[in-house]
Amino acid sequence: WTLREVLRTRLRLLAPFVPFMANELHEQLTGEPAEDADWPEPDPAREDDRTEIEERLVERLTDDVNDIVDVTGTDPDTIRVYVAADWKRDVFDAVREHGPDRGAIMGAVMDDPDLRERGDEVNQLVGDLVEFVRERPDEELDALTSVDEGAVYEDASEFLAREFDAEIEVYAEDADPEDPADKAGDAVPFRPAIHLE
């Protein structure tokens, strides 16, 4: 069904540029010429904010790797992607819950003894995440809270491997990853650390 819908839509969109071929193919596919078919419109039932967010995360990761490759002039054999530790995600959740009020956020996160031990590191992360949250609409932030970032990059690893002709390894920062360049600690929620080798 999906392939049929994609073909029907593409043929209709091609009709102004290659009318004869598009009409013939559209008629074979649907029984009516492309010129008589309605112009395709987006179907709101098929729109999914979470899927679009996940796609943007992969796109941003791809852009970041391309930037690193361009700057360093390397052709990596292995690309390691480090996803932020769970405690950083907890800080993101606190920022999301308390809004841009750093005092309220710090009060909430410092109630957690594990986060209190990380004092300065948490303070720096809160500043970065407050900026991140301010730049995004609530709908996007709502979708981000339900995203499993590690799973997104794992699912995209085949695409990334083809894109960069390299082996892709995805690690969680707090899962004792292979980290020869000590990059894992640089990961923040929705902005993974990257190491090329």
Model-based region annotation:
Residues 1-63, 82:
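Acidic, turn-prone loop/beta-hairpin segments
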Residues 3, 72-95, 127, 131-143:
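Short glycine-rich, basic-tinged beta-strand/loop micro-motifs
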Residues 8, 31, 74-80, 165, ...:
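Active-site lining segments that contact anionic ligands and/or coordinate catalytic metals
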Residues 43-48, 89-93, 179-183:
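Short, solvent-exposed polar/charged micro-motifs at secondary-structure junctions
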Residues 48, 52-56, 92-94, 146-150, ...:
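Ordered, soluble secondary-structure elements with a strong preference for glycine-centered loop motifs
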Residues 107-197:
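C-terminal edge-of-domain segments
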